[in-house]
Amino acid sequence: MEIPVPVQPSWLRRASAPLPGLSAPGRLFDQRFGEGLLEAELAALCPTTLAPYYLRAPSVALPVAQVPTDPGHFSVLLDVKHFSPEEIAVKVVGEHVEVHARHEERPDEHGFVAREFHRRYRLPPGVDPAAVTSALSPEGVLSIQAAPASAQAPPPAAAK
């Protein structure tokens, strides 16, 4: 079963919560579209009073998406600033969330570039695939989240 998940700009849900911009890549090999956010980039989204912890140097930080391993919780943050909402597709296929983004060749600061990526994440046990939502911030951060599956109601007690 395939369930398309619409990508919505986050201002549709909460227009009063702008995020500070992420740093733009300065060199061609720094363009990590479709990869997860680095720890330092996530910290830039929070005030220092909320994140006063030690940050690893970017050379040692893992460029993987932030995916919690808590059972019944699913959340992914992806940097997709090089794509427009129309160029991004998020789908639920079985027990996986698939993200595909593609744009044709267009000019950028280094010449011309065409980009495409596919990412697939397995939903952890206890997560409802029908509850997957996604939102795109004005800065190009794609947030994909899923709520835990609702707890099954206990069987009704027999009447005495």
UniProtKB/Swiss-Prot annotation:
Keyword Chaperone: yes
Modified residues (Phosphoserine): 16
Record keywords: Chaperone, Cytoplasm, Nucleus, Phosphoprotein, Secreted, Stress response
PTM entry text: The N-terminus is blocked. Phosphorylated at Ser-16 by PKA and probably PKD1K; required to protect cardiomyocytes from apoptosis.
Main location as per UniProt: cytoplasm
Subcellular location as annotated: Cytoplasm; Nucleus; Secreted
Domain sHSP: 55-160
Molecular function GO terms recorded: protein folding chaperone; protein homodimerization activity; protein kinase binding; protein-folding chaperone binding; structural constituent of eye lens; unfolded protein binding
InterPro entries: A-crystallin/Hsp20_dom (IPR002068), Alpha-crystallin/sHSP_animal (IPR001436), Alpha-crystallin_N (IPR003090), HSP20-like_chaperone (IPR008978)
Annotated positions of the Deamidated glutamine modification: 66
GO biological process assignments: chaperone-mediated protein folding; negative regulation of apoptotic process; negative regulation of cardiac muscle cell apoptotic process; positive regulation of angiogenesis; protein refolding; response to heat
Entry's Gene Ontology cellular component terms: cytoplasm; cytosol; extracellular region; mitochondrion; nuclear speck; nucleus
Chain residue ranges for the region called Involved in stabilization of the HSPB1:HSBP6 heterodimer: 1-72
Any Pfam family hit: HSP20
Family matches, as PANTHER family: HEAT SHOCK PROTEIN BETA-6, HEAT SHOCK PROTEIN HSP-12.2-RELATED
Function: Small heat shock protein which functions as a molecular chaperone probably maintaining denatured proteins in a folding-competent state. Seems to have versatile functions in various biological processes. Plays a role in regulating muscle function such as smooth muscle vasorelaxation and cardiac myocyte contractility. May regulate myocardial angiogenesis implicating KDR. Overexpression mediates cardioprotection and angiogenesis after induced damage. Stabilizes monomeric YWHAZ thereby supporting YWHAZ chaperone-like activity.
Family (UniProt): Belongs to the small heat shock protein (HSP20) family.
Subunit comment: Homodimer. Small heat shock proteins form high molecular mass oligomers containing variable number of monomers; these oligomers display a very flexible quaternary structure easily exchanging their subunits. Heterooligomer with HSPB1; formed through oligomerization of HSPB1:HSBP6 dimers; subunit exchange leads to formation of at least two different heterooligomeric complexes, differing in variable quantities of HSPB1 and HSPB6 homodimers in addition to HSPB1:HSPB6 heterodimers.
Name assigned to this protein: Heat shock protein beta-6
